[in-house]
Amino acid sequence: MEENTITKIEAQKKKKDRVNVYIDNEYSFSCNTELIYIHGLKKGKVVDLDYLQDIIEEDNYLYAKSRALSFIEKTFKTEKEIRVKLREKEFNEKIIERVIEFLRKYDFVDDSRYAELYIKERINKQGKVKIKYGLIKKGINDSIIDEKLSKYSANNENYIEAMREVALKKFNNIAKRETDKLKIKRKLSSYLLGRGYSWSEIGEVLKEIFSENN
């Protein structure tokens, strides 16, 4: 029998969409059934090992793409999150990049859109500092974050009003247990810092709250 001849192709028992391929009576590799038909692989066919390696690479890509699509099925993800997930599955960087390009092409991943939705979901509860930090951890580019946050500047009434509500609610809660204004101010400042508001934003809202509650 000639060298590098396919001697058997058998369906896997547990994964019906995959087959095992034997070369010269020895197991060689497994792949998606679709690739068998695409490349015309069949028993008795003589194959080049480099060509088989290309098929294996293509199979790895299809599997990686399938894993990525499953990962983003229920919730929107960033490119970084998808890359991390695929690296955990030990796919190589070339395949990961191909998957990311596919996801971008069909709008399955869009970091700009992700940042926009992330901000809208949190802007009434958190400050821009915390939101930006959260997006950086998600792998969003600084330029995208700054662009999306720019609309929530210090003169954005909706942003400021949301901060006032957060601050006033906490102020009333602290004031029930504490009468010393300095201690109230310190506790409220610490709380607002933890929520991601800047010192300048905190200073303005504290000035308003304490002037209204003298």
From Swiss-Prot:
The source's superkingdom equals: Bacteria
The record's Gene3D superfamilies line, in alphabetical order, gives: Winged helix-like DNA-binding domain superfamily/Winged helix DNA-binding domain (1.10.10.10)
The UniProt record lists the keyword Acyltransferase: no
Q: Which cysteines link up through disulfide bonds?
A: none
Which keywords appear in this protein's UniProt record, sorted alphabetically? Answer: Cytoplasm
One Gene Ontology term of the biological-process aspect is: regulation of DNA repair
Q: Which Pfam families match?
A: RecX_HTH1, RecX_HTH2, RecX_HTH3
What InterPro entries does the record tag this protein with? Answer: RecX_HTH_1st, RecX_HTH_2nd, RecX_HTH_3rd, Regulatory_RecX, WH-like_DNA-bd_sf
Its subcellular locations are: Cytoplasm
**Entry GO CC:** cytoplasm
Job of this protein: Modulates RecA activity.
Its family remark reads: Belongs to the RecX family.
The protein depicted here goes by the name Regulatory protein RecX
What is the native source organism of this protein?
Answer: Clostridium acetobutylicum (strain ATCC 824 / DSM 792 / JCM 1419 / IAM 19013 / LMG 5710 / NBRC 13948 / NRRL B-527 / VKM B-1787 / 2291 / W)
